[in-house]
A protein has these predicted regions:
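Acidic/His- and Gly-rich active-site-bordering loop/insert found
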Residues: 28, 35-157, 163-183
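Divalent metal-coordination and catalytic microenvironments
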Residues: 71, 110, 122, 161, ...
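Signal peptide processing junction and immediate N-terminal pro/mature segment
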Residues: 18-33
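Bacterial N-terminal signal peptides that target proteins for export
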Residues: 1-9
Length: 466
């Protein structure tokens, strides 16, 4: 997901019951996948395999769209992906994969062996978001659950994980059917809890790289809500940022709102801290070194005329290097405590949640160049953006680089060409982004792009010995 919500996502523990009924694909007109005007002939290797992939995919696409719609209608939150994981495990068994469930919680590992050769890991994420869907789609989610605080929330696949899962299953079907085109092992993983950046670590801690074939390469695809179907983008090197969660408990001395002089007001102190934190970015950081310090939540007080004893601040912090990360986290602690000292208040508690830290995502440059060249052959050079700017969103896919495994994540367009063109006009409304209640990717062409590119990338990395 490239953006997480600004506020810290709560760990949700209640169980969601999902209907097992299988919906038929809803008949929704889909625009044709755009074809570049000057698409050059791809090399013979690519042409032959792409034709075989497309032939297999043509016979699978209707069922993959139905799978997508089922998953979209029945989303499950982080750490609650029980039915989603079971459905994916069942789908992968049908392809002939050796499937293991409950790896690191709700994780699924499906191994497809096909003779000697390298090992390629292909990841999909499975969890949805606490968002009430407003797309108006006939297969829109109406799911609501209670979070751990007892608050009822809507649940929606608003980050494209449903597209990722359908493409993942489609890629497994294609590779299983075309074993004569490649040699080696593919490890498909269905990862839970990406939205709270916990699932990758859980699966690795559960022995993903010791109990199953260790990958020579790791691949992932992600939806892009701002570009048209049939296009994709990727970065060489830095792709996404470090992400840290910081909680600050601001302490004061409560009392009557009419007598502030006999209190130490933590609300005023918290407001000062919020403003002072912005100087970390504006006055302590090189303008060319990207840093984000966002206060996503502030809570304190119970009534108009009561000054509380404490205020809670919740921060998300984004950096791109280890040195900058360490410096920014120390600055947050220093600024919060200095503000309290100036207000004659008790020192605040500043806690960095290591459980919710995820390192920056760096695409292996050689792997990115290799896959990028292949994607240009598949889609045409003008449909591939190899200079996609890094974003300050975070992805725990970065953790699969453990043990120096080269990783590569790329982003496929998911909106119609018409919507994209309209959005380029002056004063046009912004397109619905990820983590919004209106994000509605086009299923069929998005899934096609995901399956075509991922299947060919796997084949490229798993060459058949002549």
């Amino acid at each position: 997901m490239p953006h997480r919500p600004l506020a810290t996502l709560a760990v949700l523990l209640s169980v969601l019951t999902v209907s097992g009924l299988e919906p038929q694909p809803t008949s929704i007109p889909q625009p044709a996948q755009p074809v570049p005007k000057s698409l050059p002939a791809a090399p013979e290797w690519t042409q032959g395999r792409l034709a075989a992939v497309d032939k297999k995919l043509d016979g699978e696409i209707r069922d993959l769209v139905a799978l997508y719609q089922h998953i979209h209608t029945h989303p499950e939150l982080s750490l609650m992906e029980v039915n989603t994981a079971k459905r994916l495990a069942d789908e992968m068994r049908k392809t002939g994969c050796d499937v293991t469930e409950k790896v690191g919680g709700n994780g699924v590992v499906a191994v497809l062996k096909n003779g000697p050769g390298p090992v390629v890991l292909i990841r999909t994420d499975m969890d949805a978001l606490p968002i009430a869907e407003q797309t108006g789609l006939p297969y829109a989610s109406k799911v609501r659950v209670k979070n751990r605080d007892g608050v009822e929330v809507g649940v929606m696949h608003a980050c494209g994980h449903d597209i990722h899962m359908a493409s993942w299953v489609g890629t497994a079907r294609v590779l299983a059917a075309l074993k004569d085109q490649w040699s080696g092992t593919v490890v498909f993983i269905g990862q839970p809890a990406e939205e709270i950046v916990a699932g990758a670590k859980q699966m690795l801690d559960a022995g993903l790289y010791s109990k199953f074939p260790k990958p020579d390469y790791a691949l992932a695809v992600h939806s892009d809500p701002l570009y048209p179907v049939g296009t994709l983008g990727f970065s060489e090197g830095l792709a996404m940022a470090n992400s840290d969660t910081v909680d600050i408990l601001v302490k004061g001395k409560g009392g009557h709102g009419a007598s502030p002089h006999v209190t130490i007001d933590p609300i005023v102190l918290a407001a000062r801290i919020v403003l002072d934190l912005q100087t970390i970015v504006s006055r302590e950081t090189d303008p060319l070194d990207p840093v984000v310090v966002t206060v996503g939540s502030i809570h304190g007080g119970t009534k108009h005329n009561i000054i509380p004893n404490e205020v809670k601040l919740q921060l998300t912090v984004r950096t791109t290097t280890t040195g900058t990360r360490d410096r920014v986290l120390k600055a947050i602690d220093r600024i919060a405590k200095a503000a309290a000292l100036g207000a004659n208040a008790p020192a605040p508690e500043v806690k960095v949640s290591l459980d919710e830290f995820t390192p920056a995502t760096y695409n292996d440059i050689d792997l990115a160049k290799k896959c990028g060249g292949l994607f240009r052959e598949i889609l045409g050079a003008e449909s591939v953006r190899g200079n996609r700017k890094p974003v300050m969103g975070a992805e725990d896919f970065s953790r699969y680089s453990e043990g120096k495994t080269p990783i590569f994540i790329y982003f496929i367009g998911t909106i119609s060409q018409e919507k994209y063109d309209a959005a380029q006009k002056p004063e046009a409304p912004r397109l619905p982004g990820m983590h919004t209640d209106a994000y509605a990717p086009l299923p069929e062409p998005s899934i096609r792009t995901g399956v075509r590119t991922m299947s060919l990338a796997a084949m490229k990395l798993l060459p058949k010995e002549k």
